[in-house]
Swiss-Prot record:
Pathway: Purine metabolism; IMP biosynthesis via de novo pathway; formate from 10-formyl-5,6,7,8-tetrahydrofolate: step 1/1
Active site, per annotation: D225
Gene: purU
Protein name (record): Formyltetrahydrofolate deformylase
Top enzyme category: hydrolase
Gene source species: Escherichia coli (strain K12)
Keywords: Hydrolase, One-carbon metabolism, Purine biosynthesis
Amino acid sequence: MHSLQRKVLRTICPDQKGLIARITNICYKHELNIVQNNEFVDHRTGRFFMRTELEGIFNDSTLLADLDSALPEGSVRELNPAGRRRIVILVTKEAHCLGDLLMKANYGGLDVEIAAVIGNHDTLRSLVERFDIPFELVSHEGLTRNEHDQKMADAIDAYQPDYVVLAKYMRVLTPEFVARFPNKIINIHHSFLPAFIGARPYHQAYERGVKIIGATAHYVNDNLDEGPIIMQDVIHVDHTYTAEDMMRAGRDVEKNVLSRALYKVLAQRVFVYGNRTIIL
């Protein structure tokens, strides 16, 4: 007796009439129940995006073969189990984003398995170990950037995570590192991108006299702070704020934006197309 499973079908394809009917009819043929369905058409690119949450008894290979025969050429589809995902978190010294994720994972605010936390400094070890989660130190001292990234990537691979989360990990990643985890690395940047790219954005914002500050969660690609944006938010500031005041206020925005972005990613709601995201 097979037990019911829940899976998420994600489809990107050239837009045509009748796509929803084709996909849902195949799901019906396989006696699968559609729990939730969301779709979007990008008229500028002519692309159709659909996320379908299914429940039933699955034969993945025949389901995907039937979909391939029904969808237009150039379609991309994937079928993955719904539910909990596994992450590795990379850190340096700042605790606010890491602490927020640890608390939410521990108390049910975020349905995720934190397999490990890896840092290039030992500063946050005691915080992590309070939650009975492994902490690994991979120091960058005496190593080139390529050598350190190689060691970090090997350490991450040992845990086989679905995603790598940069919770204020303050090192620029090499293209070789990024290539090992395509569209799997999520970063929180302490500004409302594309403004104030790079280091010390709060000091840049202070010098410009900005009236809002923000944070951006994005996928990491080869270009610094230019990967597809997942989530952003801002708060208002004024002339009385020092750069340090902005930093303190910004930390709350950063941790909230990161956890909200991660919630969407873990639920398999974020589609990457080009340098944009579609969230369904």
